[in-house]
Amino acid sequence: MTALTPNVTGHKGLGSLASRYVDIENLAWEASNFPGVDFKTLLVDPETGILTTLVRMAPGATLPDHEHMEIEQTYVLEGRLIDDDGEVTSGNFVWRPARSRHSAHAPEGALLLGIFLKPNRFFHQDGSQTDFLGRDYDKTWNR
């Protein structure tokens, strides 16, 4: 099994079929590659790209142009998230089909639970394509 929650030492040595309990409050917020967007990784599988993350967006923060490589699911815990297709508000859910592309912003800020089957591909003005952490997408995920 390659799935893990980074920076949680209590999971080391657990059997392959043991449940992994995560104290989210004690996980540190990590900066993304985008201003005003921080995250906590709850689950990641470095081999497949499966990712569950808590995302915190400051008021006015934007997730720039990106493509969902597989189905993406977002539950809004606080605030609202807006894109050209519509708006999802606190307590509501949106999912996006594989290969859908958009940018999204949080005018008043937002707290989101995101579930990804493979990380998003972000498109930059210089022509580069990266993942959420700014790593070259193809080198990282198309091995």
Predicted regions mapped to residue ranges:
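A short, N-terminal "cap"/entry segment at the start of jelly-roll beta-barrel domains
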Residues: M1-T48, Q129-R143
